[in-house]
Amino acid sequence: MLTRNLGAFLGLPAISPNDVDAIASKYENQDLAAYVPKGTHPDVLAGYKAQRSAFTKILKLKNVSILWQILSSSPRTDPVFQHPVSRGTVNIDPSNPTAKPIIDYGAFTNPLDIEIMASLVRFVRRFFNSESLAPYGPIETSPGASVATDDQLKAWVRQNYVPSVYHPVGTAALMRRELGGVVGENLLVYGVRGLSVVDASVIPIIPGCPTTLTVYAIAEKVSRPGSLGIRCLLTK
């Protein structure tokens, strides 16, 4: 249940049961180096490969959300892809280090994402065409009946997607340093004395839910006396 709205959080087996094994296998056998930003550090690439080991299992699980289907009082629904495998970048502007960072979402740089996103749209179509909703007479206005083939649907997704639902994470990931991590389990930055990071950037991958409550939970663990926060303050 979402505030003032309804939402469904569904795993890939519920969305595309006939294709889930093929999708997971395709990801497992990819050459990830071909789909990461140019100049990606070997440690960061190693981290992506470690995440892939987890993702190939996640994609097959019914209880891990791949689709967040937002249902509200408006005459539309927006399928949100919870676990994209494409990776973007956040960099300092070399011409002005004090300016806003340069952000590249890297959306659909891994072709598997466009395939999964198309599956999400097909699922939403089936949902609104289901017998349960027939009494309400839903009418599809977008993408519309003329968008029928896989190629047409993928092209429509590319033209209409929004690259973010404002859940950015991972720029200071809690991972081992040799996997591209920035902070350890105590949230202290590697190689810097007394500096810790406590925000959404430490989450290595987007959780299958809005990030707000996850960040609250991290902050609570840090702020309570005798917990992680005290250890951070006393570390020399």
Label the predicted regions.
Residues 1-74, 131, 145, 152, ...:
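Mid-to-C-terminal "cap/lid" subdomains and adjacent gly/pro-rich loops that border
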Residues 8-14, 102-109, 136-147:
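Charged, low-complexity surface segments at secondary-structure and domain boundaries
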Residues 76-132, 157-236:
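C-terminal structured subdomain/cap of oxidoreductase catalytic cores
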Residues 135-150, 227-236:
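Active-site-proximal substrate-binding core of FAD-dependent oxidoreductases
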